UniProtKB/Swiss-Prot annotation:
Cofactor(s) needed for function: Mg(2+)
Subunit description: Homotrimer.
Pfam families (UniProt xref): Hexapep, NTP_transf_3
Chief place of localization: cytoplasm
Taxonomic lineage from the root: Bacteria, Pseudomonadati, Pseudomonadota, Gammaproteobacteria, Alteromonadales
Segments of this protein annotated with the region Pyrophosphorylase: 1-232
Name of this protein: Bifunctional protein GlmU
Source organism per UniProt: Shewanella baltica (strain OS223)
Note accompanying the cofactor annotation: Binds 1 Mg(2+) ion per subunit.
Region span, N-acetyltransferase: 254-460
Active-site residue numbers: 366 (proton acceptor)
């Protein structure tokens, strides 16, 4: 039996006041609908039907390379009408899981519980109890022996509910698991004879009851999982809820967050034990932190690997880089893709490293650019050093071997190799290879002009 997931994503989202389709608005740097798609994959979907409408070009530009079956809903005539558009792509023996592109926080564990709750050839509905259920469809039950809550007999929408039904606190989330054959039959029987003139997906529950089909329910761990975003205020609330959830995961995994409310996680972060993360740190992409790593305030880490005992000092940007054991970067350092700091290496303030390896114990303390370079062990890079790697057309490599001392304000014009133990005098421009243990100084001889006077400002 295949798991066929239908994701409803056709709405415009007028209240967002945006040209962007509602489901493409981001949570943690990823569109809401992408969160839902990713979760669908995690529960083992065999096929995903994406029901789209408004902003088709933008949706396809964002999601087009993924394994999705695109189903057009030309007119938005209700949730039942939306699912019906996917009917031709649903097999009789499929289990159909219905999700929503603007409900991004639904968790894998919740959907697995819902699927497990579905009776054989029956229906499972995800419900939640709210203190204030205003605006939601209510779950209608009737007393049944052996079922404390009673048997589900239908779902009534807010606008169609009686005064008595409005007192019900158990609400429909819209998420459900349904057998394919029966779903298609029920969808064909839907009517829009209701207060909103729409084809309600929820009406299939009463049909299931009338047909004698077993109906069961499951509930999420938290109500926030099933909340959607119709405007930017709600979007921000979902963002905060997502960040709080991810921060909690980090703390349970061994990280100490200085303030869990001031961290942004926009990807997948793996942490070791006794990690310390200060305030206003941003993680993007896939980030791995070893044991005893320290991350300073305001740092940004993107797709990087940080080994045990390493330190990222405040306001540094680490992207596509690797830091070895006890290496350090910052404050105000920038490591670009391809940068690698070996054990005990140090990159200081206002140093930029790109596609360069910094050897064991080597250091560049301040104000330097090191690009397209291989730097050995025990090297000292003075302030103001630049590897001149670009000739206007191509990039070239600079090699600095072990135990080299590079004086301040030195330019190394690549391609060039500096031999082991060499010393480069401050202010030198190196255009040719330097041998082992050589001292090279290229600056102009110092001149002393006696009797010289500074210009005097002319009075006007």
């Amino acid at each position: 039996m295949a798991l066929n997931v239908v994701i409803l994503a056709a709405g415009k989202g007028t209240r967002m006041r945006s040209d962007l389709p509602k489901v493409l608005h981001p949570i943690a740097h990823k569109s809401m609908v992408q969160h839902v798609i990713d979760t669908a994959h995690k529960v083992g979907s065999d096929a995903i039907q994406l029901v789209y409408g408004y902003g088709a070009d933008k949706l396809q530009a964002s999601l087009g390379e993924q394994q999705l079956n695109w189903v057009l809903q030309a007119e938005q005539l209700g949730t039942g009408h939306a699912v019906a558009q996917a009917s031709p792509h649903i097999a009789d023996n499929d289990t159909v899981l219905i999700l929503y592109g603007d409900v991004p926080l639904i968790q894998q564990s919740t959907l697995e519980a819902l699927l497990a709750a579905r009776p054989e050839n029956g229906v499972a509905i995800l419900t939640v109890n709210l203190a204030n259920p205003m605006g939601y469809g209510r779950i209608v039950r009737t007393p049944c022996e052996g079922q404390e809550q009673g048997k589900v007999v239908g779902i009534i929408e807010q606008k169609d509910a009686t005064a008595e039904q409005l007192l019900i606190n158990e609400i429909n989330t819209g998420i459900m698991a349904v057998p394919g054959k029966q779903l298609k039959a029920w969808l064909s029987r839907l009517s829009n004879n209701n207060a909103q003139g729409e084809y309600y997906l929820t009406d299939i529950i009463a049909m299931a009851h009338d047909d004698g089909v077993a109906i069961d329910t499951a509930q999420p761990q938290s109500a926030i999982e099933v909340e959607g975003a119709n405007n930017r205020v709600q979007l921000a609330q979902l963002e905060r809820a997502y960040q709080a959830r991810e921060a909690e995961k980090l703390m349970l995994a061994g990280a100490n967050l200085r303030d869990p409310s001031r961290i942004d996680i926009r990807g997948e972060v793996t942490v070791g034990m006794d990690v310390m993360i200060d305030i206003n740190v941003i993680f993007e992409g896939k980030v791995t932190l070893g044991n005893n790593v320290t991350i300073g305030a305001g740092a940004i880490l993107i797709d990087c690997e940080i080994a045990d005992n390493a330190e990222i000092k405040p306001y540094s940007i680490i992207e596509g880089a690797k830091l070895g054991v006890a290496a350090s970067a910052g404050p105000f350092a920038r490591l670009r893709p391809g940068a690698e700091l070996k054990q005990d290496a140090h990159i200081g303030n206002f140093v930029e490293v790109k596609k360069a390896v910094i050897g064991v114990g080597s250091k560049a303390g301040h104000l330097a650019y090191l690009g397209d370079a291989v730097i050995g062990d025990g090297v000292n890079i003075g302030a103001g050093t630049i590897t001149c790697n670009y000739d206007g057309a191509n990039k070239h490599l600079t090699v600095i071997e072990d135990n080299v001392f590079v004086g301040s304000d030195t330019q190394l014009v690549a391609p060039v190799t500096i031999g082991k133990g060499a010393t480069l005098g401050a202010g030198s421009t190196i255009t040719r290879d330097v041998g082992e243990n050589e001292l090279v100084i290229t600056r102009v001889k110092q001149k002393h002009l006696t009797g010289w006077q500074r210009p005097v400002k002319i009075k006007k």
